[in-house]
From Swiss-Prot:
Location(s), subcellular: Cytoplasm
EC code: 5.3.1.16
GO biological process: L-histidine biosynthetic process; L-tryptophan biosynthetic process
Active site: 7, 129
Pfam families: His_biosynth (PF00977)
Gene that produces this protein: hisA
GO-annotated cellular components: cytoplasm
Spans through the membrane: none
Chief location bin: cytoplasm
Domain of life: Bacteria
Name of the molecule in the record: 1-(5-phosphoribosyl)-5-[(5-phosphoribosylamino)methylideneamino] imidazole-4-carboxamide isomerase
Pathway: Amino-acid biosynthesis; L-histidine biosynthesis; L-histidine from 5-phospho-alpha-D-ribose 1-diphosphate: step 4/9
Taxonomic classification: Bacteria, Pseudomonadati, Pseudomonadota, Gammaproteobacteria, Enterobacterales
Gene Ontology MF annotations: 1-(5-phosphoribosyl)-5-[(5-phosphoribosylamino)methylideneamino]imidazole-4-carboxamide isomerase activity
């Protein structure tokens, strides 16, 4: 499916280039209107990133998410600095459909396993931000991509499979926000290796052709942010393109 994305700072829709807060672009969009339009076009879920919360957990945009859930009908998944059980419970109790876990996957693996077991695999999305080197080693980066780890994508997924892991949002960080096109090889490989995982592809989608090629890799969803905001194509075109390849 197509998953539109909004990155949010103080309620405003922005895009960061390569995760850099000092390199942000503001978009003059009405978030609530956009969500209702997307719902009317057949969108089943929207991806929201709390960039304030990602930077400082004290600045989480909880009131905004409360308003979104109560005033709109499209389900949402929310990510950005979710690090504690309280963070997860607060969002799920508001009515958020799924929470997206990032850095804790590496820094607090056992806790993340407990979350998968407690909340259920349909409520949790693991966000794996990957740097692929010349030898095809897929190293996980955390903390807004600022810090590389020694953890490898495949090892992380294997670790959580026993807890029923179902949803993985995988981003090739060299492509995000660039409109340079996705890393098709990466998605084809991981979809082939982990057939029971619902992969969400993120980063670099610039054209309808990218959607066609991504669908063929086996991903279950495509997250699209900048291309929709900058009207490279319409949501109707994206949805039709995805459905045509089914």
């Amino acid at each position: 499916m197509i998953i539109p994305a909004f990155d949010l700072i103080n309620g405003r829709t922005v895009r960061l280039y390569q995760g850099d807060y000092s390199n942000q672009k503001n978009y003059n969009v009405n978030l609530f209107n956009s969500l209702e339009v997307y719902k009317s076009k057949g969108i089943e879920i929207v991806h929201l990133v709390d960039l304030d919360g990602a930077k400082n957990s004290a600045n989480r945009q909880i009131e905004l998410f409360k308003k979104i859930v109560s005033h709109t009908t499209v389900p949402v998944q929310v990510g950005g600095g979710i690090r504690t059980t309280k963070d997860i419970s607060t969002l799920l109790d508001l009515g958020v459909k799924r929470v997206v876990i990032g850095s804790s996957i590496v820094s607090n693996k056992k806790q993340v396993k407990q979350w998968l077991n407690f909340y259920g695999p349909d409520a949790i999305v693991l966000a794996l931000d990957v740097h692929v080197d010349g030898s095809n080693k897929k190293e996980i980066s955390i903390d807004g991509w600022q810090k590389k780890t020694n953890f490898i994508l495949e090892e992380i997924i294997e670790y959580f499979l026993s807890s029923g892991l179902k949803h993985v949002l995988c981003t090739d960080i060299s492509r995000d926000g660039t409109l340079l096109g996705p890393n098709f090889k990466l998605y084809k490989e991981i979809c082939s290796n982990f057939k029971n995982i619902n992969f969400q592809a993120s980063g670099g989608v610039a054209s309808l052709q990218d959607i066609i090629f991504l669908k063929k890799t086996g991903v279950k969803s495509i997250i699209i942010g900048r291309s929709l905001l900058e009207k490279k194509f319409t949501i109707e075109e994206a949805v039709k393109c995805w459905q045509r390849e089914s």
